[in-house]
Amino acid sequence: EKVEMLHSKTNMSSEGVPRLGIQDIKYTDGPFGIREENGDGFRPLGWKLDSATYFPTGSALAATWSKEMAYKNGWAMGKEGRLRGKDVILGPAINIQRLPVGGRTYEYLSEDPVLAARLSVEYTKGSQEAGTAVCLKHYALNNQETNRGSVNVIADERTMREIYLKPFEAAVKEGGAMCVMPAYNKVNGYYCSENAHLNNEILRGEWGFK
């Protein structure tokens, strides 16, 4: 039963434990809208009387420099997610904008770690107070799409903490983020999903993530 809970049941759900009354966890891959799953992918459902909201990209949201707007954006996403029966939004995407030509740079909030941190906190609070958990992504140092599954990002401790980890730290410690998604890349030689320094020492040990 524990193993079943730790991997996908479908493309966007994890197995529950019916014997204990634990329901499946249903995800939606934001971060700009609540998508509906169709079998193994995201083909059109063909619904005639339904549509989804397309929310602003991270860059557009950050351009407001408004904590209030970030909260409202998160709250609206969370509210729509709850109405559609979702438990977790796979977002916000809060990596630092490092490369202007990066394939997903538009998803991220800013090149400014303080701005990204402040807005991440408010978005997180808004969504979770509306009833849908966030899943912060991509932890950590996922700042390019080229070879994102294999690139080894080399960074010293001060650089990581002052720039790249700051939004994640704030969203966990101040926003109370319920989920964190590991990045595909390596950091200093270890894949993020099995990086003891990032996950055990910093995320759990220092920031108190549970």
What do these predicted regions represent?
Residues 1-210:
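Glycoside hydrolase catalytic-domain context in secreted enzymes
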